[in-house]
């Protein structure tokens, strides 16, 4: 099923090519999205979105509702250099007032990773689109596309680990 996570819209089905299987492995490692690493990553992504929206406002463009509205090319060309790698909560609040997330609260004394958590959803959205296209191509007989789909899956894990530092 293809979900568009803005906030969660089912866009349709993407068939798994004949002769292809997907395997999930239960590592038995417990993960909770309620803990600080996940909250801090979410805060960092919302900080990045706020910085981008402030830039957009200064240049007469409308605000983004979701980071995934940006292409990777747009993000890299127009915003990536403006997003700090890390930022202390109090510095962010002084400059931007809020991060516009009703679910999390910025702690003034905490240091948040901003660049990686902001980059992840933009790049992940593009990876998902490439993954679906690869599955469609494989269904039409292009077996090299299955390798491309696998590379997208590895890329998703690497981004989650490196940009979000959650794996």
Regions found by a protein language model. Give the residues of each.
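C-terminal nucleotide
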Residues: 1-167
């Amino acid at each position: 099923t293809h979900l568009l996570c803005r906030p969660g819209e089912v866009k349709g089905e993407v068939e798994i090519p004949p002769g292809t299987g997907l395997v999930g492995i239960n590592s038995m490692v417990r993960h909770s999205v309620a803990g600080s690493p996940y909250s801090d990553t979410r805060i960092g992504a919302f900080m990045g979105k706020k910085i981008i929206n402030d830039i957009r406002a200064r240049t007469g463009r409308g605000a983004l509702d979701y980071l995934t509205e940006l292409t990777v090319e747009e993000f890299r060309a127009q915003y990536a250099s403006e997003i700090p790698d890390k930022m202390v909560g109090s510095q962010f609040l002084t400059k931007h007032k809020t991060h516009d997330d009703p679910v999390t609260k910025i702690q003034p004394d905490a240091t948040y990773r901003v660049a990686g958590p902001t980059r992840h959803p933009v790049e992940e959205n593009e990876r998902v689109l490439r993954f679906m296209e690869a599955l469609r191509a494989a269904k039409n007989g292009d077996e090299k596309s299955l390798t491309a789909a696998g590379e997208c899956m590895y890329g998703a894990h690497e981004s989650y680990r490196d940009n979000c530092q959650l794996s």
